[in-house]
Amino acid sequence: MKTLHRCIGVALLALGALAGTAHADRIKDLTTIAGVRENALIGYGLVVGLDGSGDQTTQTPFTIQSFNNMLSQFGINVPSGASIQLKNTAAVVVTASLPAFVRPGQTIDVTVSSIGNAKSLRGGTLLLTPLKGVDGQLYALAQGNVVIGGAGASANGSKVQINQLGAGRIANGATVERTVQATVGEAGSIQLDTGTTDFGTVQNIVNAINKQFGADTAEAADGRTVNVRAPALAADRVGFVAKLQNIEVTPAQAAARVVVNARTGSVVMNQQVKLEPCAVAHGNLSVTISTEPVVSQPAPFSQGQTVAGARSNIEVKQQGGSLINVKGGTNLADVVKAINAIGANPQDLISILQAMKAANALRADLEII
C-alpha cells in the first residue's frame, strides 16, 4: 500500500502543477525543424594502458587480431602461433552523434564501450579510431583518455563495484573530418514537426505564426506538421528561424493518458484522466516454497553411508477479495485517491487498470510500456 501511495504520489507531484491555467510554450520547445538532426557514428578500436583489467585474449581472439593488425601498420610482424597475453588491452566500440551544421576541425564527445570480457576501462587510452556513418564514409577520428564514472575493487573473493566500469566517455574526443549537409528552407519552406499527433496544437502554431509574420505564412500539412514559407536568401533564414522559434504558443489540452511500466510497476497519469464510479474485487494469490536440509544417518556398525538431501514444502494461499466501491473522479487528485483506496500493489494495479478500461470506467488511453 505504501509503495502504491509513493508511486501515484510521484505522478501527482509531477503533474499536479499542470492543473492550473493553460500556459504558453515557445515553438522551439514544441517542435523540431525537419532536416536539423544528429547522425549516428560508430567505430571499432582498442583501449590500451589498462592495469591488468583488459580482455582475456584466450576468450576474445578478435582482440589479438586487432592488435596484430595495428602492429603491422607500424612495420612490426608478430610470429604466427605466438601466444600473446594482452591483459592491458580491450576491444571496444566507439559511438558518437554528429550534430547538424558541425564543421571539419570541430570536436564532439564519444562513448567507449567494451565488447569483450574486460573487467574495467578505467585508466585506459583509446587509440586512433575512425568513426563512420551508415553510408560507410569516415566522418570523424576519435582518440583520447577514457573517463569512467564507476569504481570497483576486489580481494580474496570479495568484490565491490559502483556504477558501470565497462563503458566511459571522452569529452571532445573526436575531431570531425566530414560534414553532413543540412538543408533548411532551401525549397522555399520550413517544416515544423510537433513529434506527436495533435491537431489542436498544430492549428494554434499556425495561428501564432500567421499573427506574427502575416497571413498565409504558415499552413498545417497534417496533425503533426506545419509548413512555413521561408525567405529566399540563406542569410535571412537564420534570423527568420530565430524569431519563429521564440513565438509563444498555447498547446491544446493533451488526451487523457495513463502510462504503466510493467517491469517496475510505476504508474503515471496526466490531469485529463477521469474515473467513472465502479466496483472492484481484488484478491491475492501467494505461493511459498521452503526447503529444509535433511540428513539420513545410518545405524552404528551397519556399514551404511550418510546421505544428505532436501525436503521441500509448497504452500499456496489465496485471499478472497471483497467488492470495493470505487468513487468516480473528475480531477487528478480524486482519481489518485480512488485508486489508492483499492489497496493493490503496483503490479496488481496493472490488471485492475486494464479491467477498468475494458469496463469503460477509466476515461483515458492506457499505455503499458
Curated annotation (Swiss-Prot):
Name the InterPro entries for this protein.
Answer: Flag_FlgI
Coiled-coil-forming residues are: none
What's any one GO cellular component for it? bacterial-type flagellum basal body, distal rod, P ring
The source's superkingdom equals Bacteria
Does Signal count among this protein's keywords?
Answer: yes
Where does this protein reside within or beyond the cell? Periplasm; Bacterial flagellum basal body
**Which interval of the chain is the signal sequence?**
1-24
Q: Which processes are annotated in GO (biological process)?
A: bacterial-type flagellum-dependent cell motility
Going by the UniProt record, its keywords in alphabetical order are: Bacterial flagellum, Periplasm, Plasmid, Signal
Q: Name one GO molecular function term.
A: structural molecule activity
* PANTHER family with a match to the protein in the record: FLAGELLAR P-RING PERIPLASMIC PROTEIN FLGI, FLAGELLAR P-RING PROTEIN
What binding partners and quaternary form does the record give? The basal body constitutes a major portion of the flagellar organelle and consists of four rings (L,P,S, and M) mounted on a central rod.
Q: Which family does it belong to?
A: Belongs to the FlgI family.
User: What role is this protein assigned?
Assistant: Assembles around the rod to form the L-ring and probably protects the motor/basal body from shearing forces during rotation.
UniProt name for this protein? Flagellar P-ring protein
Q: Which organism is this entry from?
A: Ralstonia nicotianae (strain ATCC BAA-1114 / GMI1000) (Ralstonia solanacearum)
